Amino acid sequence: MSPLRRPLQRRLPLPGQRLVTLTALTPLLLLGACAGEDALNTDEPSDDSGGGQVVIGGQNYAEMQIMSEMYKALLAADGFDVKLTLVESRDVYTPEMQDGNVDVSADYLSSMTEFLNKQENGADAETVASPDPEATLEELKKLAEPTGIEPLEPAEAQNANAFAVTREFAEQNDLKTMSDLAELGEPVTLAAAEDCSQRSDCKLGLEEVYGLEISKVEPLGFGTTGTKDALKSGEVDLGQVGTSDATLETEDLVLLEDDKELQNAENLVPMVNSGFLAENPKVADTLNEMSSGLTTEDLADMIGKVDLKRELPEDVAREYLDGKGLI
C-alpha cells in the first residue's frame, strides 16, 4: 500500500449491498421455459394479454433486474404476455435470443459488441468497441445482423468499468483523475474481477495507458462488498467498480475520472430478436422511448433503492416508469 495513505477502520457492509447471482441456466432450461414449463426465476405470464407472448432474458443482479422489470412493465402495458428469465451470464441468454427462444434483453453496448465480435472472429479478435457510443453501436449492428438479433437505441445511462479510492485518500493526495493517481509514482494494489490481470480495460490498460505500477491484484470481484471492504480497510489502494454504483457515496468511496478514456462505452441498449421485431415493430418505439430519457443518475438512484433500501426491483421499475409517464 502507498505510504501516502492512512488506512480506514474496517466497517461491516451495508445490509442490501450484496449482488444477487444465480447458477447459469442451461439453454435447455431456457427453452423449456419458453415452451411453458416452469423454470428457475421465470415469471408467470402477465395478466394483460393481447399482443402475444414475449420472453425477456437477462442477467440476475440488481441493475439488470431493474432493467428487465422495466421492459416487462412496458411490454405488458402494450398487451403482451411477458415471461422473464434471469440467468448468470450473457453466454447463456444470447444464444437463446439468436435462436428465437428469448425475444428481448437489456445489455451493455461495448460488452455485447465484444461478445459477438469474439463469437464471430475468435477469442483473439481485435477489439472493435470504443469509448464512442455511436461508433460502437454501428459495430454492434454489423455483428448482430447475421446472428438474428438487433440493437435498438442505447440509453445515456451506462455502467462502465471504473476505479475508486477512499474519499480520505483522494482528499489527502488531491486525486480527481486516474492520471493524478499515476503521478503519485507509487505502486498500487488493486481489488478487481478475477480476470482483471488479463484485461486491457483493467490491469493491462492501467499499466499501459496510465503508467500505473500495479503491484498486486486481489481477485475480490467487480464492485463487490469484498472489494469495497478491502478499500476501506486499507488492504488495497484501488477498487474496480461500476459508474452507476449507488453505494459509493455511503461507503465514502469516490470514482477517479477516466481522463485518458481507457474504458469503452457501456450504455444500456435493448437487444431484440430480429424475427420478433419484424412481427412486432411497435416494441422498438416502446423501448426506445424509455431509453431516450434514462440517465446514469436515474439508474444509480434505482439501484440504491434495491441494494440499500431493499425495495423490490419490480416496484422500483414501475415507480420510475410511472413517474416518467411511460405506463
Positions of predicted regions on the chain:
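Bacterial N-terminal signal peptides that target proteins for export
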Residues: P3-T23
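C-terminal motif of bacterial Sec signal peptides marking the signal peptidase cleavage site
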Residues: L29-A33
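Bacterial signal peptide processing site
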Residues: A35-D38
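Short, well-ordered beta-strand elements
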Residues: G50-E63, D81-T85, E186-A192
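Short helix-initiation/N-cap motifs at beta->coil->alpha
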Residues: A62, K83-P95, E194, S215-D229
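Short helices/loops that flank or line small-molecule/ion binding pockets
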Residues: E69-L74, D91-D103, L204-V209, G223-G239
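Acidic helix-start/capping segments at beta-turn-to-alpha-helix junctions
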Residues: L86-V102, L109-F115, N121
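Contiguous mixed-secondary-structure segments that line small-molecule binding/active-site clefts
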Residues: S110-L204, E208, S215-F222, D237, ...
